[in-house]
Structures are given as C-alpha cells and as structure tokens.
Amino acid sequence: MEEEFLSFKNFLQEDQDKREKIIRLSREITIQSKRMIFLLHQTSSSDGFPLPKDFDRTSIFEKKIHKELESLKRELAGLNADKFSSACTHGLQEYVEAVTFKFWLQTGTLLSCKDSSFRISINFIDYVLGVCDMTGEIMRFLVTNGSKFSVQQLTQQVKFLRGLHKNCSEIEHLPSKVKSELQQKLSVMENSISKVEGICYSKILREADKRYLNLEVDTATPPEEKRLRST
C-alpha cells in the first residue's frame, strides 16, 4: 500500500513539474511575442504599409520564440498533451496574434491556421482567440496611420474586420469556458471595429468637405479671374 501511495505521489509531482515548465515556456513565448508586436508597430509606422515580404527585423524575437516552441513541443509530446493545453494557451494565443499581425502588415489578409509560418501545431481554439486579439493591433495601427490610407483602403479594412467578427461569432459547440472567453474577445473586437469605422467615416467627411469647399471657391470666382488663372 505504501509503495502505491509513493508511486502516486511521484506521478503527481512529475505532473506538476511538467505543468510548471510548460507555464514558464508559455510566459516566455508571450513576452517575446509582445516584443515582436511592439517592433512591428514601430517599423510599420516608419516603413509604410504593406511591409515587404522579406521583412526580417523581427527575426531576433522570432528565433527566441521558435526555440521556446521546440521545447514546448517536446513537453507536449505524448498521449496527455490535451491535459496541459490550458497551461500554454495564453502563450500560443499571443504567438498567433504576433504572427498573424505581421502577415496582415505584409499582405492585408489573414494567415491560415495551417500555414507553415506557425512553427507548432496550433489548435483551432487558440488560433481563433489569437486572431480576435490581433484585430486590436490592426485597430491600433490604423488609429496611428489611418491618415496615410485612402478611403478605399480604409473601407477594405473595415470589411475585413467585419468579416472576421462574423466568422468568429458563428463558431458553435465550444466548451462553456472557451465560449465565455470568446464572447469577451468579440466584445473587445466590436469596439476595435467601431474605432476603425470612425476613422473611415472621418476620412470620407473630410474629403467631402474638401470637394465642397473647392466647388464653393470655383463657383465664387469671377469668369475673368478664371481665365487669367488658366493662361
């Protein structure tokens, strides 16, 4: 009996040690992913949109993330990987947010869940939750740089964000805990979309005002002055 209890105690201790190691790896992935996102905001504001396909200024963080992901894959290898998914979900969500934001800055589109850019197999739930967070980065980017975009470009991004929200809100048969987290992220996403819509509407109004003022000036200018200006 004593040997059985000792064996069970060792099993629980090994389980706890593995969980703590996975949590540490997840935290490091989160930290490096946040640094990557911060640098993406800095460089995209100065380098313009879209970023070149061979953009590599975030490679210093990506290499660190890839190293942690390799360690995480080793820890998750085996039949009990699902048991530890909650220990690494936040790190993987942040990783998805960083990678998809970079891809959006390069292409203006969404990176697929199965794309080889991800250095680890991403489950669909972590992917969706990470993409929801990524829309907040798009909003922050457009708030800072919206004046550089045309009405057509801004309208395109509004449609893109609305489409993401629609697709994410239609996902069904989720565990109650995941469903609650998704609903919270969708609520934040709605606020982000509203801000981007506001940027777009303001741009439309400013351009309409300019056209109206130009028309007013043109109408008020005497014909003689118009002829002098044209010669």
From Swiss-Prot:
Similarity section: Belongs to the translin family.
Protein name (Swiss-Prot/TrEMBL): Translin-associated protein X homolog
Organism, scientific name: Schizosaccharomyces pombe (strain 972 / ATCC 24843)
Signal peptide: none
UniProt-listed GO biological process terms: RNA processing
Pfam name, any one: Translin
Residue ranges of the TM segments: none
UniProt keywords, alphabetically: Cytoplasm, Nucleus
UniProt xrefs under InterPro entries: Translin_C, Translin_fam, Translin_N, Translin_sf
Effect of inactivating the gene: Deletion of both tsn1 and trax results in slightly stimulated cell proliferation.
Keyword Nucleus attached: yes
Single GO molecular function: sequence-specific DNA binding
Annotated localization: Cytoplasm; Nucleus
